[in-house]
Structures are given as C-alpha cells and as structure tokens.
C-alpha cells in the first residue's frame, strides 16, 4: 500500500513539475549568451554570443547542450537539458526527504514546494547552470547520507568524491555539498582519511580543468564576485547582513511561511544524528553564501536541502496543533482526522504557496512557443 501511495505521489509530482517547467521554459537572461558561447566552444566554432570566458569553469551543462545543438537550436538545447535536471531534481528531493525524515507526508510537501520555489521558477530552466547545480548539491548530499559516508568503504567515498568533482564543474556552489560531507565526516567519526579523500579528489578535478582551459578560479572570483559586488552592491556590513536575511527569506517564498515551518520542524526534531546532518548542511551552505561577495537568491537558495524537509515536518506539526485539538473536536464534530485529511491540508498549503510564487513572477512566464528574453539581451546573440 505504501509503495502504491509513493508511486501515485511521484506521478503527481512529475506532472506538477512539468507544468511549472513548461510555463517557465528556456528563459534567456544577461548571463545566458556567455553559456551559449561556452556550448559553441565545445563545437569548435565561432559564436555571435562572444567569448565564453569564465563560463568555461562550468562546462558540464554547456557541453550537454552543445550535443543537442547539433539537432536543435541552442536555446532549446539548454531548456531540454535543464528540464531533465528539474524533473530529476524534484523526484530526488522526494527520496532525499524520505531518507532524512522517515516521514509519510514531508517528502511530498518538500518536493512540491521545491519545484515551485521562486529561484526554481526564475532560473531552473533558464539558459544557465543553476538547475544543474541544485541537482548535484542534492545528489551529493543524498549519497553522503544514504551511504553513511563517515563509515563507508573507501570505494564509496571515492565515488562520492568523483560526483562532487563533476558537480563543481557544473557550478561552483556544489562546493557546499563538499563542505557538508567533510564536516559531517569529521564530526561523526573524525576520519581524516575519508575527509581528505572527499576534499582532495574534487579539488584535483576542478583545478585540473581550470589548468586545462587556462582560466583561473581566483580571477573569476575577483571579476565576477568582488568587482561586481563593489560596483552593484556597495553596502555597509550591517546593510549587507540585512539584505542577506531578506534574500534568504525571499528565496523560499514571498512571505516567510516556509522558514517558519522549517523552524517548527527543527524544534520538533530531537534525533541527534539528524541535527548533526542539518547543522553540517548549514555550515556548507553559509560558507559559500558568505564567501561569495554578491548577495543573490541563486546562492541563498542552496539552503534548500535542509529547509524544505524541516518545513515538511513543521507542516505536520501545524496540522496536529490545529486539527487535533479539543476545540476542533467540539466545534467541528463531523471532521474526520485521517490520512486523506492530512494530504488535503498539505495540498491546500502547497496550492497557496505555488499560487503566490507564480503570481509574484507572473511577468516571467515563459512558454515553449513564446519564451522570455531579458530586454537587455540582443536576439543576435541567441544562435
């Protein structure tokens, strides 16, 4: 019965994700032409988008898009690659939450709000690398927990390290999963060998690629991070902290309901190892958030592997507080507390959340036959 329920939930999740993806499809933003150029670089041909420059430090998505580009136009190629990662990421979020919480309702809630979150609607299927980064963050953390990497064989540790290395070549923010893996390993078993393996293999992969293409991560950090922040976000430390707090809240919704549910879920969660996992995720995520000089929802959203599962636990606690009180039993005697009523409450909350995020981003609706292009992007650069 549980297996059938999971299958039905996964079908519903896939349909919902596809609906969100096809109404926020293939957006082109000011950064996109650089990724088009990176894709054309792998085809060894010139491009009207210009030089790929630092985007070559994120080669995986452009490489995959370049393969599809032999059959489809470049914009559609990126859209399809990211659409696959979006659907796979939503399903992985379901299984990850199930692994982390062992809860009946949290996996569905977590994966549904993940797929309708503001950064997902804005960037997941855009001609960028964000969705690939979110997928690999989730995949790496899932594997670390599933295989209990602090106590796993060295073979499994090496496999996870290789996946981390590939993930960092998708997007540098995947390094938050590396920091999580090292932190949790040292905290749980103090295994220096495993921690060193998890750190050194991804480092060798990323630096090896950097050397091969002749582009420095330090130069990218200086130009794309420090210089950009100085020009576009000249803030005092206090204002930067306030902006960061607001940005984290906005990453998870127009209003702070998801963060409040997450806080409630954390308060309810008393399992020691689970708390270690969440704290290790926060260490990794905030290390990247604070290290990158630019404040952006695309980076603050990397807290999602902790926030959404906790919010799922928090929602169940809200249901218990609201619908299992003596007051409800006395004033609403016909109400039946059942699995169906709990799922109905969950879907109501998800529908309200998705409605708000979609209304907030109504000007960014992007359909396959009428995709959104930022006004600052010249159509000649999309080729």
Segments from the language model and where they lie:
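Membrane-interface helix-loop-helix junctions at transmembrane boundaries of multi-pass membrane enzymes
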Residues: 2-4, 151-154, 189-197, 262-281, ...
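Short hydrophobic/aromatic helix or loop-helix immediately within or flanking a transmembrane segment
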Residues: 33-43, 51-73
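Membrane-lumen/periplasm interface segments of specific transmembrane helices
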Residues: 34, 190-264, 353-366
